[in-house]
Amino acid sequence: MCIRDRQIDDVVVSFDVLREKFLCNLDACKGECCIEGDAGAPVEFEEIEKLEEVLPVIWDELSPEARAVIDAQGVVYTDEEGDLVTSIVNNKDCVFTCYDEKGCCYCAIEKAYREGKTDFYKPVSCHLYPIRIGDYGPYKAVNYHRWDVCKAAVLLGQKEDVPVYKFLKEPLIRKFGEDWYAELELAAEEMKKQGMI
């Protein structure tokens, strides 16, 4: 693998992914990232089939409103920017969101995965948040997305000294592979030695 600046193979990684701190704090935010925003979570075309396959497993967990949206338009739609995203209820909640007794939002797909009912964790864009993957010419761009609803996660990440890329090790490996992540860690260590991050 070739690393130049902050590039690993055909992936350009924002310095913010390496230097900013982040650690989800569900007790504080209650899973707000799954219910706020103007569109659903980005979905890769290959994930549509997985989302449809998991529906019978999670159907009873979903709200009646979410089931109605899925019946009417499916598990995904194309947003105003032309991207495939998860369907949403009332222009905010992802159709796969559920709530526990404390009012904390959780993903019905992830819950089913943790219970051993499916081998699909959830869309990779959800797993990667607050990282967003975009296109940058012939390259993939790995960017840190700042959002006010995640202030508590930033504070906890700073307190515990957890960089974004370390917090998201598992989903980064899921997306790009073990070797790629090992190169990312090496690049981060070298940049830290040089005082770049």
Regions from the PLM with identified roles:
Residues 4-197:
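Short loop/turn segments that flank or connect secondary-structure elements
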